[in-house]
Amino acid sequence: MGIEGVLEKGFVTTSADKLINWARTGSLWPMTFGLACCAVEMMHAGASRYDLDRFGVVFRPSPRQSDVMIVAGTLVNKMAPALRKVYDQMAEPRWVISMGSCANGGGYYHYSYAVVRGCDRIVPVDIYVPGCPPTAEALLYGILQLQNKIRRTNTIAR
């Protein structure tokens, strides 16, 4: 967490930024936005073998209850407004993980007229997880990278 000092009688000193970011990294609640086969790997990551609950990651069904959106799969033009609407309904601070080649840049369907060539054209993306489909380990690594990114951010304006 970044303990700055330990005082007598069991007191610990740290900054408010470090304390808030430590709490945020321990309770990431992702909104699952599974669009294709990558969603199966996302479910695999939440199952007993990898158990994302031990990292404080609890999948939520509502955007108002979540602070992370995992976009997994091919984003088509008809689904893009719905993706943006769900993103806008999430509370601040919010983060987006783009999972798979299709979500990152269109993937196999890149040249199709109906496919958005990357969900970063619709919502700002914080972490890209490559693969077709990416493994559960890759998603887990992406979540750990997001936790590292959150730890480095400043919460309180100076």
Curated annotation (Swiss-Prot):
GO-annotated molecular function: 4 iron, 4 sulfur cluster binding; iron ion binding; NADH dehydrogenase (ubiquinone) activity; NADH:ubiquinone reductase (non-electrogenic) activity; quinone binding
Cellular location(s): Cell inner membrane
Catalyzed reactions: a quinone + NADH + 5 H(+)(in) = a quinol + NAD(+) + 4 H(+)(out)
Keyword Iron: yes
Cofactor descriptive note: Binds 1 [4Fe-4S] cluster.
Positions bound to [4Fe-4S] cluster: C37, C38, C102, C132
Topology versus the membrane: Peripheral membrane protein
Coiled-coil stretches noted in the UniProt entry, renumbered to this chain: none
A GO cellular-component term linked to this record: plasma membrane
UniProt cross-references to InterPro entries, sorted A to Z: NADH_UbQ_OxRdtase-like_20kDa, NADH_UQ_OxRdtase_20Kd_su
Self-association and partners: NDH-1 is composed of 14 different subunits. Subunits NuoB, C, D, E, F, and G constitute the peripheral sector of the complex.
Function: NDH-1 shuttles electrons from NADH, via FMN and iron-sulfur (Fe-S) centers, to quinones in the respiratory chain. The immediate electron acceptor for the enzyme in this species is believed to be ubiquinone. Couples the redox reaction to proton translocation (for every two electrons transferred, four hydrogen ions are translocated across the cytoplasmic membrane), and thus conserves the redox energy in a proton gradient.
Protein's UniProt name: NADH-quinone oxidoreductase subunit B
